[in-house]
């Protein structure tokens, strides 16, 4: 294959690999390093079909004694991590003169030009941009495989690569940078990759806050500055100071669904920690502004507040500094001692914003606009986006927990068992109690521990400032009563204001019933008065795909959104769809820009809310420059989906998609649910059980005891990713596409792919995940780990993988997957040289681990866990 990847990227990867080699040699000697090189060269040759290479690889791996397994897995893991750093930096490195800018940089300006060409006037475009409401919800699972300590070192390596890119370096300066890189890589090598203990929910939340502090805090004002400049250049209008087209929310410390470690006290601590972090960040901003705004000239409006002073701006800003210090000190004291807030504590964003806006107006009025539009404007932009609370905390709980709490209450009150009531009886009682002025619970009521925790969570919500909270999400919602149940529990806790209570529909049946459920809800007397803003509905991608396969799940998600748009239109209510996407294709993941543009027409309408998952937060927002690129994509995609939506699909396309979905779900469930040996095969062929020992996040891997249905979507995906079968992302498509092609529907499929963004995006994401799949690697897991009676099932699944690859190639007209993207092909090829040895070592480690069942801290178990992390790094995803 001709070398397509940029020479500078190759140079950085080579340099980092060489420095890692120096570090390994220094600790383990030349002989050990030579084994690494033999394994790498053997893997590279074996990939090209060399029998000698395959033999060299096998012999060298067989020659490793047990003490060498851990450092060997660490070597390949760290090389893949370093390759990721080089790739990530390459995305944002300075471009040489004449080099084309990345797509992400110009996407917003290109869109404005297209909107104008489509007949939209300047005022309309500017107004739509200022009204955009995009909210990215940071979640903790799948939590980063990499430890936060290592992530900080990886970021420092990226900074040194940027420094090395300067063209005017002296030899001494270049040598100094390379010495710094050598030192950082040595620090990485001598730091354990795997946490000894699971993080607590509060630690997860702090990880999320760190992503904001280290990257998004800088990226957001830069993006809004660029957006404003583009808007002004192309329309003559500015983005208003108060505009916040992108905001952030979080599930870290609020998502208690299936996680007993997230309690009411944890959510309270996370809310206070967010206030502390926000106050600390703004304090640094204000101190910088006090230093910068030393000038005397000021408007009469400002002088009326500052009095006669040589430094009027400082007079206005110094009290803000004191109040931010007081807010920060109180937040810490409240976490430790539950101390009430003194009067000096900032409670409302306007208390901080008004003096800053006054300074801004005064500077412009006095001819100092260039000063106003610097750090002061950035601070105002941050304030509009992050507010006083940094992120809005969502609360999530399973509908069954609310029903159980109400059943306990109705039983205590002598009304019977709420859980046994039909839907109409539940609604009648809930409506009556919501309208009743008296409390539901008598003062002497003593709930069980589970019910007390539900009530305590509602009490924390009632006490927290409204602006610190996002939505209350009800997972596994089935009916209108699920929403009213939460509203009643919040009323009982003393909540006096409306809060968004959001049903999450996440199985195939629930997605199909989503629109009728919302229709019934909006028809209930009194419900509209309790509705806070738009009707928010969450679409579950992960669990619906695990339930029905991605073919049927994707179509059910699309149709549910179409129907919800229609229902809300009939009721005259605005709709906000909240997309619960994962990081992987099997959990609804994929490129955000394409995904947004493939939504049904009318479903975006200027609003878009979506989860950003664990490891994807680092890949998409870990470095400020990369965060800027991804935020640009969100802005452009949501604006385009709003003003240039795709046309509705043709009736014939719908019929074809109905058939594909029906055949897909039958094929998927025929294997996953109905094959009697599937669960045994899954547990033997993948490291699913071993993944439960990996301290990934605060949340247990299972909801309850049982088979595949009890597994959370993340370990389900993660396990198949490790073996490279990638089964959840494609199972069902092989039957659906093969059947359609056999029926002579190839032209129809090609037309759908060419003209329907929904279908083309699905096929593109399917192709990407198939390019990561590797039947030969999956076969090796089977041969070493699976009992003989289960081997035929593995063989059948690999045959199905071949079928779906053939179908996709037929549909795309390519000879090989990703022929249209040779750079991506080459990147995968380079990674396989380092992934193949990790897979082979993992297979051996799994076999030995299952024979011995040693303690988690033994070198064997540590090597196994490092292999898991390494494969995740090589494939750029976990679950």
From Swiss-Prot:
Matches recorded under Pfam families: PEPcase
Gene3D superfamilies per UniProt: Phosphoenolpyruvate/pyruvate domain
GO MF term set: magnesium ion binding; phosphoenolpyruvate carboxylase activity
Gene Ontology biological-process entries: carbon fixation; oxaloacetate metabolic process; tricarboxylic acid cycle
Presence of keyword 4Fe-4S: no
One Gene Ontology CC term in the entry: cytosol
PROSITE patterns: PEPCASE_1, PEPCASE_2
The protein's enzyme class: lyase
Database matches in SUPFAM superfamilies: Phosphoenolpyruvate/pyruvate domain
Reactions catalysed, as given in the entry: oxaloacetate + phosphate = phosphoenolpyruvate + hydrogencarbonate
Catalytic site positions: 141, 546
UniProt keyword list: Carbon dioxide fixation, Lyase, Magnesium
EC number, UniProt record: 4.1.1.31
Functional note: Forms oxaloacetate, a four-carbon dicarboxylic acid source for the tricarboxylic acid cycle.
Family designation: Belongs to the PEPCase type 1 family.
Record protein name field: Phosphoenolpyruvate carboxylase
Gene source species: Stutzerimonas stutzeri (strain A1501) (Pseudomonas stutzeri)
